Amino acid sequence: MEAARTERPAGRPGAPLVRTGLLLLSTWVLAGAEITWDATGGPGRPAAPASRPPALSPLSPRAVASQWPEELASARRAAVLGRRAGPELLPQQGGGRGGEMQVEAGGTSPAGERRGRGIPAPAKLGGARRSRRAQPPITQERGDAWATAPADGSRGSRPLAKGSREEVKAPRAGGSAAEDLRLPSTSFALTGDSAHNQAMVHWSGHNSSVILILTKLYDFNLGSVTESSLWRSTDYGTTYEKLNDKVGLKTVLSYLYVNPTNKRKIMLLSDPEMESSILISSDEGATYQKYRLTFYIQSLLFHPKQEDWVLAYSLDQKLYSSMDFGRRWQLMHERITPNRFYWSVAGLDKEADLVHMEVRTTDGYAHYLTCRIQECAETTRSGPFARSIDISSLVVQDEYIFIQVTTSGRASYYVSYRREAFAQIKLPKYSLPKDMHIISTDENQVFAAVQEWNQNDTYNLYISDTRGIYFTLAMENIKSSRGLMGNIIIELYEVAGIKGIFLANKKVDDQVKTYITYNKGRDWRLLQAPDVDLRGSPVHCLLPFCSLHLHLQLSENPYSSGRISSKETAPGLVVATGNIGPELSYTDIGVFISSDGGNTWRQIFDEEYNVWFLDWGGALVAMKHTPLPVRHLWVSFDEGHSWDKYGFTSVPLFVDGALVEAGMETHIMTVFGHFSLRSEWQLVKVDYKSIFSRHCTKEDYQTWHLLNQGEPCVMGERKIFKKRKPGAQCALGRDHSGSVVSEPCVCANWDFECDYGYERHGESQCVPAFWYNPASPSKDCSLGQSYLNSTGYRRIVSNNCTDGLREKYTAKAQMCPGKAPRGLHVVTTDGRLVAEQGHNATFIILMEEGDLQRTNIQLDFGDGIAVSYANFSPIEDGIKHVYKSAGIFQVTAYAENNLGSDTAVLFLHVVCPVEHVHLRVPFVAIRNKEVNISAVVWPSQLGTLTYFWWFGNSTKPLITLDSSISFTFLAEGTDTITVQVAAGNALIQDTKEIAVHEYFQSQLLSFSPNLDYHNPDIPEWRKDIGNVIKRALVKVTSVPEDQILIAVFPGLPTSAELFILPPKNLTERRKGNEGDLEQIVETLFNALNQNLVQFELKPGVQVIVYVTQLTLAPLVDSSAGHSSSAMLMLLSVVFVGLAVFLIYKFKRKIPWINIYAQVQHDKEQEMIGSVSQSENAPKITLSDFTEPEELLDKELDTRVIGGIATIANSESTKEIPNCTSV
């Protein structure tokens, strides 16, 4: 889950300003933008060493170098982000910034931790927002030499403290030609700091004329800051004063922080290589107090409401708190995961001083804890989630808290809505996420980008219900890329000012195309290209073969406009860089603008420009995106239809960025740059108030209606906005509001999306997915209560439509049916089968179906102690028990209500480091005939292992030192086999079921090739597909369901075996029953041969089931001579196995063949019979291979050649230690 875009967080010093002539590489951040360049002017190196605070979370790059044309890519490589590799990149809590800023996804999922990938923190899409995460500073490095240098760009001698100014006269009203228009400006040089290669800038802009700039010299060889200067302006940047004497001439400063709730309060950190101290100012940097610290600060997190409350994270992973703005500090907790601590959220957490934090444990896991900053003792801490969680997975964002738990290699995500109990996030059953990022948590809804098991460079977009639990698909295959910091960029953009409008770049047949939605992802369409180009020539571009495509990455540099921008105070106005054609391109790009929320577009430039909003969207200012020095900018008052050219400096300036937002109220913008390669930093103050003739009046506005391809209802309402009339050069002012009137519409189909478990067929029909049973109520539905039975539709969150189809599509209340307990499970909190003697072992009891409130629970710990509960409520957080002796304990959970009961067993042991075990059993066995059962263990080189085998209801295991065992089942029915493998101090188990019958017949099945593309190759999917095939066979042939068993094999191509079983009410007339069975086989065989058996996997995917064998398979039973053909086939299997064995042994003596065998072993099935296997029949066992983990990854099962019987996966319940990486 990853941040898509967020406002400048609190507690972060600013990100870097890069001193370079290549504006493509400039990266600035408000509230202390840090500038870094190599002292030689060459390509920089990472600016933060291991001892420094880690870098600020990466802001989304405007483009990745490898995606640009070669000449641009090489230019972009001239500067790099100079940050130390951090463990996690997250949005922060609070403000701490100058002016407003919007940035895109920050943060890579951490790699290298033990327990699965963590959840990158979420942030808000579109519009300015407050984020609540801690984040350290960032550094960036100066690029290579600039392309050219002005002739008069040489440096002169200037006083160290005063700098220099250059005055530029304002033009007369209604000046002459556009090229003669000038804007009043002043230029100031930070004289004496030309050697400094980093800088941080802060200007709040809110009723303040103060600008602070911290410059410093970072020595890459020493890994520390060796010099620093602090500059302060009180006249909006006209002049600056050097403050080194006020902070201490020998004090070397490293970072600047601004309080987000009171921007007059400033914090400066000294470089820890020199000393550990903090300087505090309460008068906007005029005076400072210095305090020594006993720890080294890595990052700060200010409280979003209380201006004096601060959290400090140290380099040794300790969390400190201060309630007096850093004058005194108190240790809260140790072993805190970096960037995983959060302040309370007003209106949700009861205490304002509550802190949410993730604490690492000594065994490689983490716990989610909360405590108050002044009362964080062990007795006062709370654990809202009882189980261990993955490291770097805690996210607290708005109304939601997210965590991740990885068990048996598969991650599960949990969410708490408004601090309620955690619930597991429900994605469509077979989404199987490899990676997940939170895009947005706006408007009581979660947007999540999920990379599924069959995706590599794309993500699917899912949107949730209000509680953030049930997710449905909004768009497939959204393009992703890696940022300069390695962060994931999801190319999705929310248009500010109008809810529900998103732009997304989707990968379609290896082409990337831009789509737009007006109803939060329910419907998407391509962008219509402009009718004419910039020169007025017709553009011949017909949908869907040709359309407009946009670059949706936001700027990594808040001092550049980014490649797409919109503004809350200018609804409907979108400016973006893109191209016209069949797909998105990084060549032949221009700048396009839409005045009506993306319905229509016009081209305004034929090359790349930075375009900013002036006067809260009332005007636009543009500056060419070029590595060359510039003197002019362009201003438009009619939404880009026409532009006026203004000069802002008499000497051409290599522009590194411009600060526009902070000076919005005063109509002042600051342009940062330099006149030559070795010159000082130049800060050009541009006063553009003269371009406005007056304040706007009522007569200066006009209205416009928001439409979606002519449809006036967008997100269930009609909206009318007002905007300034084109050409009116009047100032809007801060209080300008764009919205005029809004009224609800009658609900139509496009106001509803498919509910969880349903998929879209056609334009508006939602039907259940093949894996979903809509008739099954939630497991927390108690008898006597009611639940909402979905109609398959749910109204889009924040949609305001009324009446119409609303009643038809609204979920209907139904009484909860009584249900017997089913799917009972007992697990340990960490998912492992190990407990230390004398320590707490915590058990969790789970139940798939049943009445939680009316079911009695009993848990027998297996050591003579048992506990009972009247319902599930007291045990939701787990049942703790201390074992006083070591050994094997059979822990039994029993659930019962008046409709039935269920039992679950867990075998607990103190065991060794075995990581995986795979139990291989046949699906079907013959009564009174031996069955060969084996276990495959990984890693294979573990020495002596002990195997514990449980058959059926036995309470004592059979213990062997061999990985295989033979067993005879004496009665018909379904039996359970459990194996536990112990070695050293670890124990793992696998459980499977086997059907025992007097006789059966089977047929091999194959499928149409389109099923392979949708095959994730996991047991649950194979089981569901088997059920779908069974239902299809029953429907076509009317054969009783209990006489059919389908076993879908692992691997590709997808294949299966059909077992035809005798009826349950088997009589003594066996001959007749065998005849009936053969008749059923012939009926099924004919139906399959006629292609009558098929099913729809998903909309548009129809799968046909075929018979692999051309002839009917013989009957398999307990009679030795019943079928000579069966015996011949079995003998064939034996001889083939012997031949393969000999060839394999011979191949082992030839090195290159041996290598081939090792690589290919995951495709070679073991050939063993499920019934009466010969004792002396040679076979190839999986343990012969050197890399059995490949087999376990695919969970390879074995089958008998010729279709006699099959070794395959049955439903498996595994208790395997959680051994994944985060």
Curated annotation (Swiss-Prot):
Residues 135-1125 are lumenal. It is a single-pass type I membrane protein. Homodimer. Interacts with NGF. Interacts with DLG4/PSD95 and PICK1. The gene is SORCS3. The chain crosses the membrane at residues 1126-1146. It comes from Homo sapiens (Human). SMART domains: VPS10 (SM00602). This is VPS10 domain-containing receptor SorCS3. Plays an important role in modulating synaptic transmission and plasticity in the hippocampus, probably by affecting the trafficking and localization ofAMPA-type glutamate receptors in the postsynaptic density. Residues 827-917 form the PKD domain. GO terms for cellular component: glutamatergic synapse; membrane; postsynaptic density membrane. Residues 1-33 form the signal peptide. The lineage of its organism: Eukaryota, Metazoa, Chordata, Craniata, Vertebrata.
